[in-house]
């Protein structure tokens, strides 16, 4: 930011976007943003997190709630998550009822609205079990089309990956049971705990580690949140999160024309379905997994650091140079 009085510069300050909607100034860039905060169950790894759950007998969301209660009142927590879910629902509603073309040189047509009309028309007469997948796709497309149009979204964990966490919760709301405050609070607490692990130990910035740090992390978070709602143990929740990331390792960030549209919008839909599958696979597993959540987080970060800069949000490689604007 530069401010001038006539030709003379009177103020200058540099800020950095570090992913997930977070911004820091130059003085604090690269430094820990959190001071000494006293919570009953401080954790920096999935191993520590699971240790507290085993020690206390609490679910993952229950353990995280105790930490939140050390920082905020119960009413503040409830109000915050109510606002998050309301914002997500409103975004889905706008996205699936808005037609037209997204702004930018690609002139990408919105798809969520047409898909919704198709589903509403055929749902009553169809016995295709895969219609559920179509609905999940529609929820995610709706959110990311709103993001691409400059609409209001929740950065969970980032703008480019904002469709996955709400799409999976909308799936639960639509196909399992109506979402109540208790349900969305548990979902967000579990998903948020997983997101915090990536933020502490890796990155959620596509510019730093590629799309695995955005869509991959969102998939991991949503898988964990859904597993929590389906009655998974803390260990199973972490297995779901691990599966969600393991199969996004190496995912590049190569937005065409620098727009968060192609491949980003469709990729959120694919990852939403993948998150649901990861949750189900984790809960039906009978053997001990060979890959832990901590190891996959570490691997993701190392993979991102090794990734060529062409594939880290620069639009200098991949689809970004193969797909031309008309």
Short names for language-model regions:
Residues 72-210, 318-326:
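Accessory "access/gating" subregions that flank catalytic or transport cores
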Residues 1, 15, 81-85, 92, ...:
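Long, contiguous hydrophobic alpha-helical segments, chiefly transmembrane helices and signal peptides
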């Amino acid at each position: 930011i530069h401010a001038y009085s006539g030709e003379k510069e009177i103020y200058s300050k540099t800020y950095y976007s570090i992913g997930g909607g977070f911004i820091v100034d130059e003085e604090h860039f690269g430094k820990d943003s959190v001071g000494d905060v006293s919570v009953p169950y401080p954790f920096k790894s999935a191993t520590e997190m699971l240790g507290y759950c085993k020690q206390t007998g609490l679910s993952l969301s229950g353990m995280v709630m105790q930490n939140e209660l050390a920082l905020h009142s119960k009413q503040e927590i409830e109000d915050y998550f109510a606002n998050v879910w309301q914002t997500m629902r409103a975004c889905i509603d706008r996205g699936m009822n808005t037609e037209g073309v997204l702004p930018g040189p690609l002139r990408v047509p919105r798809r969520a609205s047409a898909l919704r009309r198709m589903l509403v028309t055929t749902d009553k007469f169809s016995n295709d079990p895969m219609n559920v997948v179509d609905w999940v796709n529609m929820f995610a497309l709706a959110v990311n089309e709103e993001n691409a149009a400059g609409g209001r979204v929740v950065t969970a964990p980032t703008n480019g990956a904002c469709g996955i966490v709400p799409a999976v919760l909308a799936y639960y709301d639509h196909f399992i049971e109506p979402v109540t405050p208790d349900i969305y609070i548990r979902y967000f607490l579990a998903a948020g705990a997983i997101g915090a692990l990536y933020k502490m130990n890796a990155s959620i910035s596509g510019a730093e580690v590629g799309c695995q740090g955005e869509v991959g992390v969102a998939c991991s978070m949503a898988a964990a949140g859904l597993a929590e709602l389906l009655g998974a143990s803390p260990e199973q929740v972490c297995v779901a999160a691990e599966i969600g990331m393991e199969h996004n390792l190496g995912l590049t960030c190569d937005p065409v024309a620098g727009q968060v549209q192609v491949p980003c919008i469709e990729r959120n839909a694919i990852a939403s379905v993948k998150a649901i599958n990861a949750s189900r696979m984790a809960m039906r597993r009978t053997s001990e997994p060979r890959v832990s959540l901590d190891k996959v987080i570490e691997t993701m970060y190392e993979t991102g650091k090794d990734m060529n800069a062409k594939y880290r949000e620069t639009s200098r490689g991949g689809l970004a140079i193969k797909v031309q604007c008309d």
